[in-house]
């Protein structure tokens, strides 16, 4: 009788524990979809006028930027500009400008001879130059799309604090590059 009782307790325990295990079984997690580029490529570089669009897959995420570098006669990079889009479609970027700029004064940006100006400050300096973060509003993006040059004006860190206003980023191809960047981000 005691054996039957023990057998009954053990079977009850096993049936309860197997039911408990059955309830705790989680369905196999579905893998998140991995970002892809056209034709299954792992990286992509395309040229639109003077701008390039570069994309790559990093940790399963698609990362794309637009890039333009302005060089001098010796092919040394004077300044560069990268542009990206966030999840809401906000256009932002970074300028890398030469050393010797008074970092306590803003960098002023305007397209061609427009009176619309964006000001931003140097964020940090790295071996390539000083980095200036920029966020463009929709009106300024429209000006960039239609313009010929993004002109920069800054103060030189020199006696008398002269203005340096002959640096610019050429915008030939900007509009098509931004259109492609937008389509790649989807």
Swiss-Prot record:
Gene3D superfamilies: Invasion associated locus B (IalB) protein
Highest taxon, organism lineage: Bacteria
Entry-linked InterPro entries: IalB_sf, Invasion_prot_B
Keywords: Signal, Virulence
Key word Signal present: yes
Signal peptide annotation: 1-22
Functional note: Required with NudH/IalA for erythrocytes invasion.
Family statement drawn from the similarity comment of this UniProt entry: Belongs to the IalB family.
Protein name: Invasion protein B
Annotated organism of origin: Bartonella bacilliformis (strain ATCC 35685 / KC583 / Herrer 020/F12,63)
Gene expressing this chain: ialB
